[in-house]
Structure formats: C-alpha cells, structure tokens
C-alpha cells in the first residue's frame, strides 16, 4: 500500500491555488525557489488523479531519477504509473522526426523557462500541438530568461496565469529555506592587485597618481594581512567533515583547483576526499554518487563543471564555492540553490571567490529585496522567524572595488580632459574654429 503525499503548508497553498486556476483555465504555473519542493507538488497532483495521464518535461534523466528517489522517501510505496518523463532534448528529437506523442491529460513543464530556448521550444510546441486538450502546468524558480532579452516565460507560455509565486527572500524570512552566510573574497588577489597597479600607472596627473598609489599600498597591505582563500575558508567553515561543492568555469580550471585542495581546505581538515563531475565525464555520475554516499570524518569536496546547476538536490551540503564567474542571474541562483536545498548546516556557507554577487544586479539587490519583503509580510501581520539582518555578507573585496571604481572614474575624467585639450589645440590651429 502506498503512502499518501502530505505537503508542507506553503506547498499546500501553492497546490490549492494551482488546482483552482486549472479549474477555470487550461494553463497555469507556479513560481517557487529551488529547494522548496516543487516536484512534490507535481507528485501530489499525479497521485490525486490516478485516472489521468501525465507527461513531465524536464532537463535531464538524472534529475528525474533523483527526484523519484527522493519521492520514495517521502511517500514509500508510491509508484506513479500514470506519469511519464521526457527530456526537452528528447521532445526536440520527436519534433524533428515528426513523431506524434499524444494521449496525455496533463503536460507538466519543469523549469519551464527552458521552453523559450529555440530548439527545445520547438519540441515543447510539438508536444503541446499533439495534446491540444491537455492542461499545461509549469514550475520554475526563474521564469525570466535573462540572457534572452529578459523574456518572461510565465507570460509567453502561460498567458500570465501565475497561480502561486514565492520569491527566495520570502522563503528565507519565513524559514522555509535556510539563510546563508555569504563570504566574498578573491582567489586571485595578486593578479587583481597587478591590474590595479597598472591602471594607477596610467594616470598622468602626478598628484592624483601619488594619492592612488598611497591608497593602493594600504589596500595591498590589508589584503595581505587578511590572507586569501585558505584563511577565508578556515575562518568560516568550522565543520571538519563538511560536504562542499566547488563550481568551476571549465575542466582545465577544475584540475587546477583540485590540485589546490590542500592549500584551500587543509586548515579545516588534513583528510580531504576529492570528487569531480563534468558533463563530458562518463564516470562523473559514479563520483557524484560516491560524494553523496561518503559519510566519513573526512572533508568531502566535489568539483564540478556544467553540472548540478539545476534540478539536482544533494542532501547534507554545508558550503558551496563559486569560482565560476557568471553574469547570469539564472546560473547564480541555481548554484546558490544547491546549498539552500541541502538540508545540511542550518546556516549554509557560500564562498564567492569571483565576485558574482557584485557582478549581477539581481543578486546585488538581494538585501534591498529582503527589506521590502520583510516590510510587506509584517504589514500583512505575518509572524516571521527571521529578519533581513540574518542575511550576513562578509565582503573582503569591498575596499578594493571602491578603489577600482574611483580609479576608473579618474581615468575616464582624464580621457575627457585629453579630448578637450586636443579639441582646443585643433581650434587654435584653425583660427578658433573646429
């Protein structure tokens, strides 16, 4: 006998709102942060409607298998035989072959922002055309396609029918997701200092240059005294047997960072178990599983490239390390979600060693949105267990970035003054005319 799926209060509200909207309309979506249990809502709908056939579209097979494994823990004995899974890539191939995939009562698009992609979108359209009478349901944490002109797929695909929406800041303040401690530092401080020194050397005004040189020397000294990556990790990561995920930009960098593991993490624990997973590695899934299963006293570190960004949940992760620079809010939140949904340390750690927080406008506005959300929720007489001040940002690069901005403005002003001088000289040569 299978277990009945029971939803947390916030998911029950989302589920009820979704059913209400589907009672009136053919399409509806739910927007909730990663880690709040979107798949459980899907499973609940499938369980409550055994006479209906569901087709779930998602990004990869591993995601579905991972979610089904989690479902087995939540609802032992429940095997949803009326649910079929298909990747967006497979849907695209059926469209190319002209193969009809029909007979479904409900089509569910997980991470539905992907439906706006040119090739995957054609596959989704092909599926929906073959199931014209089906209800269409979508789930996503990030409905906006930031890299695609800011397209809102909730509007495009669901006609703006958002049944329920919760932002990350609300999930934090309500205690649905743990609020992380966010540490910003440089992993290449000497290189960054070298670039800054070169910029200062380009200043023509000697007095201005000397002023910046003095500031630079104070900054260099403070960065040296504060230490680098090793010191930052040792200061904040106190759990010796922690599980850590390191997001790397490419395979070459992954190898480099793996070689640095003792330098970076050695002050936390001398015994380090290192694992890696990359999209092109046939053994990556084995390493990933070994990382998840490792319950030893060692510090466990998983290095990854183009993996674990989306829809994959790892229990017990205590920290993530960002060394993959990105301008994409979607990628930023996907990586952040790996530690928020982990169920590990109550105060998970985020080590941002490439200033993603300061490089992405959406991320930089998190503190302000926390304040706005807190004001809105308390105005609705909601009792909140956390306040905006619980989101702690330790920024070891702030002074550096402020000085860099100041120098950049000075160089810009210098360039403007050079242009004015040039124009004045041209005017003199032409009898006062340009």
Put a short name on every predicted segment.
Residues 2, 148-242, 382:
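Interdomain helical connector at the RecA1-RecA2 junction of SF1/SF2 helicase-like NTPases
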Residues 338-367:
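Conserved segment of the helicase C-terminal RecA-like domain
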Residues 61-103:
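Inter-Walker segment of RecA-like/P-loop motor cores
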Residues 300, 306-345:
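Conserved RecA-like helicase motor core of SF1/SF2 enzymes
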Residues 245, 256, 268-308:
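Conserved helicase ATPase core of P-loop NTP-dependent helicases/translocases
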Residues 99-144:
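SF2 helicase catalytic motif II
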Residues 214-235, 243, 359-434:
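Long, largely alpha-helical accessory region at the distal end of helicase-like NTP-driven motors
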Residues 24-45:
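Walker A/P-loop
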